[in-house]
């Protein structure tokens, strides 16, 4: 899914959907398009880094104790617990990007995306939010993608598929639903939405 928050000094684009649906690949291709003026908002997580993940680029990797301190200090727009790990979106990261007159790109799982919607609803800015939920062509393909990633156990994959089924039921909470049949076609669909919704792009 993708949520775009329209703000005078920049936009927030949130990509969301089940794990393994291709959010990371879509995000990478969007960031390559300089016309979109996108900057990736690096989230905080308590999970261990995967192979080739870089501190400060893919995530800020913190211990559970450090994450808890950030919660107490109200540093997050949203945070959630997923597969026994914490994930959170830092207010400071979003503000820094918007302050530099860029649009913010946030790739986030569904619970976090819904929490962001709640956050901006409280700020009476819900009309400025555009959401896009990325769907898999089939659940079987989603399972294959996660399996090919090689970073989860069979039990973790079962949990992810079960969670994906629940997340897909929430798709109507987002303004747009896109199916990622073919990566480049899906990216073009996202870009077309951005061009329609953000007139200056």
Swiss-Prot record:
Enzyme class: transferase
GO cellular component, one term: cytosol
Keyword Transcription regulation: no
Binding positions (ATP): 17-24
InterPro entries: GK/Ca_channel_bsu (IPR008145), Guanylate_kin-like_dom (IPR008144), Guanylate_kinase (IPR017665), Guanylate_kinase_CS (IPR020590), P-loop_NTPase (IPR027417)
GO MF terms held by the record: ATP binding; guanylate kinase activity
Catalytic function, reaction form: GMP + ATP = GDP + ADP
Domain of life where this protein originates: Bacteria
SMART domains listed in its UniProt record: GuKc
Subcellular location(s) per record: Cytoplasm
Domain Guanylate kinase-like: 10-195
UniProt key word Transferase: yes
EC number(s) given by UniProt: 2.7.4.8
Family: Belongs to the guanylate kinase family.
Record's function text: Essential for recycling GMP and indirectly, cGMP.
Name listed for the protein in its UniProt record: Guanylate kinase
Organism per entry: Mycoplasma mobile (strain ATCC 43663 / 163K / NCTC 11711)
Gene designation: gmk
């Amino acid at each position: 899914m993708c949520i775009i928050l329209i703000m005078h000094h920049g936009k927030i684009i949130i990509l969301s959907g089940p794990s393994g649906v291709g959010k990371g690949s879509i995000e990478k291709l969007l960031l390559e398009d300089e016309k979109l003026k996108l900057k990736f908002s690096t989230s905080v997580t308590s999970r261990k880094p995967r192979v080739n993940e870089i501190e400060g680029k893919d995530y800020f990797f913190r211990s559970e104790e450090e994450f808890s301190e950030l919660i107490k200090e109200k540093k997050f727009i949203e945070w959630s617990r997923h597969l026994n790990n914490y994930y959170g979106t830092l207010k400071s990261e979003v503000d820094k990007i918007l302050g530099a007159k860029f649009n913010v790109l946030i790739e986030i799982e569904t619970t976090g995306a819904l929490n962001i919607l709640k956050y901006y609803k409280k700020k009476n800015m819900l009309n400025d939010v555009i959401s896009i939920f990325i769907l898999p062509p089939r659940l079987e393909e989603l399972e294959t993608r996660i399996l090919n990633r090689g970073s989860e156990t069979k039990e973790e994959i079962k949990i992810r598929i079960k969670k994906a089924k629940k997340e897909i039921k929430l798709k109507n909470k987002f303004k747009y639903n896109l199916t990622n049949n073919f990566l480049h076609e899906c990216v073009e669909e996202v870009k077309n939405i951005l061009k329609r919704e953000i007139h200056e792009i």
